[in-house]
Amino acid sequence: MKKLPLLLIALFLSCTLVSAWDVNKKYTGPKTPTTDTTWHPDILSGYEARYVNQGEAFDGPCRSTIIRKLNRKGSRKAFLYVHGFNDYFFQGEMGDRFVDSGFNFYAVDLRRYGRSYEPWQYPFNIRNQEEYFADIDSAIAQIRRDGNTDITLGGHSTGGLTVAFMGAMKGKDVGVDRIVTDSPFLEWNFNSFMRNIAAPTIGYFGKMFPNGKIKQGHCDGYAYSLLKEYYGEWTYNTDWKMVYSPPVTMSWVGAINRAQSKTMKNAKKISVPILVMHSSRKIDGCNYTPVFQTGDAVLDPFMLQKRGEQIIADQQKEQMKRAGKKVEKISNPNILGSQVCAIDSGLHDLILSEKAHRDAAYDTIFSFIRHHLQN
């Protein structure tokens, strides 16, 4: 009987919010794996890209895409960037800044996103967040083949969740030297009921009805704050990074829930320094006003700060235990040099903020990396 209220909530949500239908039903052509995996000029000038076949997935053959721009001075330091939800790598300015700062720059478009999207796929769909590990591992392997010996793994939003999750689940086998996150999706921006009951319930039923779809709000505030044709500074493909986010599947909700939970439960296993960056301000609303240029309109930065501090505290306690020291006598809890940092008036994607604020984000990232390169 104790489970009855939860089941009733689930039934209500399933009936009112979700339309369970086959997300692949519109495509009737062949599902042919990519055959050309050689390097080719990228859509971004000065960059090159190549596809990586990732085998058969629940919806057919899938692929990821590695994008790179190499430092001409022969650097052996690399930065690998993982984009967020409803997103892809288009931030040429970011890659250029890393290259100009002495790094080889890499990015990955994950399966079903951007360059990696195939016509039989539903955009951004996922069953388990672990699926992305193969995409990231392929990029790391390429980075190693290119002769790099020091790798920083970075991620934004759901990409930030994924790289933190990867660090928590793989521990010492994560294959990188440090992790940088930009507004990582460590918690839903919902009220307590939605976070603790509704979202987990939808995720649970997502195992039975993975293709059920949940409509997103018809909000333009964040997209308008980014796009140059409206009020922002940036130009990108709105077929790949849509103004209005498409419905998400129930399986996607479940994958996010599980990744968030497992990341927090296993944070102590993150064996490399981690930087958690977030905005200093939360923006509420749906349609654009100038205030959208002054904070995070997608996630709650104060919740991200709380989750980031919890991750680092668990990580540090584990490191102290391994060092044979008593946790209660920690004088400097940042034994690995992990940090949580607020960027004043940063947008949800901090590196797309107005110049002064994204410069602060870059300064934070480069300072974090330099500190660990010197120690």
Locate the predicted segments by residue:
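Conserved alpha/beta-hydrolase
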Residues: 87-90, 95, 99-120
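Serine-hydrolase catalytic core
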Residues: 214-338
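N-terminal cap/lid segment of alpha/beta-hydrolase-fold proteins
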Residues: 23-73
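Catalytic nucleophile-loop/oxyanion-hole region of alpha/beta-hydrolase
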Residues: 85-86, 114-150, 356-361
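Alpha/beta-hydrolase-fold enzymes
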Residues: 158, 162-250
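Short beta-strand element of the alpha/beta-hydrolase
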Residues: 76-84
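Bacterial Sec-dependent N-terminal signal peptides
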Residues: 1-22
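Catalytic active-site module of serine/aspartate enzymes centered on a nucleophile-bearing elbow/loop
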Residues: 317-375
